Amino acid sequence: MIEHFISDPHNVKFVESIFNKKLFSSISTDYPLVIISDSHVAEKILPPVLGFIDSLGYRVILLTFPPGEKNKTWEIFISLQNQLVDHGVSLGATIMGIGGGIVLDMAGFLASTYCRGIQLFLIPTTMTAMIDASIGGKNGINLRGLKNRLGTFYPPKDVWVCPEFLTTLSKQEWCYGISESIKHGCVADAYIWEFLHSYGDTLFSSRTILNEFIKRNCQIKAVIAAKDPKDKNLRKILNFGHTIAHALETLSEGHIPHGLAVSVGMMIEIKISLESGIMKNPSLVEQLYNLSNNFNLPTTLEELRDLIPQHFLHRFYHPENIITTLGYDKKNLSNKALRMVMIEHLGRVAPCSGSYCATPKMGILYEVLKSECDAVRNN
């Protein structure tokens, strides 16, 4: 089964199996097919996939890099670019990213910059990558530890979403992606919020429910990205929870997984929305807490403590460190005017005169963060 269910801002197909030669019909066998992945995916998932692609007559070039956020760097990027040159890859080639969000970010940035742009296909293998990272054409790498400081907008020619890959993941890894879905519910689609409340763990055991869930989330992301492909206004609502999350990831030097950082980031940012008077319904904070807890997602910085190396822990003792790191967020117009997404009510972000980002009062930001940091320092 191949279901072409999204065409804007780019094609997305929902497939039962990657082992279908019809999927590859638009990729010429006259030029190399370059697979970008990480070493973990290459070992656990790729062998049968590579065997199938090879049987179709492609000259396959596999380029991998070590897994993890700490390896989404300029140095790895340049190394991969050099390997493309060493293999004689030219404009007619296709780059295919197979993996989670980090792999897809790297593959997209490589494809957009090599020869000023070569054909790109994406095959996400994690929940986060399926419902978020693979949709919309954003890519990027970190620079000096700062999240996605370098990147482009480069839509793939096609994305193939195959839920079968999720069987290779632990339940915890599935839940990393659930945080992005909760975000979709908060900023744009209250139906997703109700869906998660209603089905809960059934999501992990029913393929029918899972398929509906994945498609709905992909469609939400696609609709928003199509309306604002270059992330100038409306698309910024998808950064809810990510302003704080990226600061936490930076300070931990990649040791806090993105999905867990986003979960905590959403709780902190929704509290800031409430304290700022933008969100009027305090019960939404409790609802977010309960929904996150249903999927074993953290809601406080203290819950992330065990993931942070001991020699980095002091960075989370004082709110000033987080606030300083927030100054480097790419949404900011300057490092003195911090901006983040504020929730007005469930399914709606405060429009803020069309920017969809607000600058919280420093006193409110400080006090909310201080409460989080005090818990880390004192426990």
UniProtKB/Swiss-Prot annotation:
Cystine pairs: none
Protein name: 3-dehydroquinate synthase
Catalytic EC class: lyase
Signal peptide limits: none
Keywords, comma-separated and alphabetical: Amino-acid biosynthesis, Aromatic amino acid biosynthesis, Cobalt, Cytoplasm, Lyase, Metal-binding, NAD, Nucleotide-binding, Zinc
Cited function: Catalyzes the conversion of 3-deoxy-D-arabino-heptulosonate 7-phosphate (DAHP) to dehydroquinate (DHQ).
Required cofactor(s): NAD(+); Co(2+); Zn(2+)
Location in the cell: Cytoplasm
UniProt main location, coarse: cytoplasm
Pathway: Metabolic intermediate biosynthesis; chorismate biosynthesis; chorismate from D-erythrose 4-phosphate and phosphoenolpyruvate: step 2/7
Record gene name: aroB
One function term, GO molecular function aspect: metal ion binding
One biological process term in Gene Ontology: chorismate biosynthetic process
Annotated positions binding Zn(2+): E180, H242, H258
Annotated EC: 4.2.3.4
Reaction(s) this enzyme catalyzes, per UniProt: 7-phospho-2-dehydro-3-deoxy-D-arabino-heptonate = 3-dehydroquinate + phosphate
Organism: Chlamydia felis (strain Fe/C-56) (Chlamydophila felis)
Pfam families: DHQ_synthase, DHQS_C
GO cellular component: cytoplasm
InterPro entries for this protein: Dehydroquinate_synthase (IPR050071), DHQ_synth_AroB (IPR016037), DHQ_synth_fam (IPR030963), DHQS/DOIS_N (IPR030960), DHQS_C (IPR056179)
Similarity-based family: Belongs to the sugar phosphate cyclases superfamily. Dehydroquinate synthase family.
Residues that hold NAD(+) according to the record: 67-72, 101-105, 125-126, 138, 147
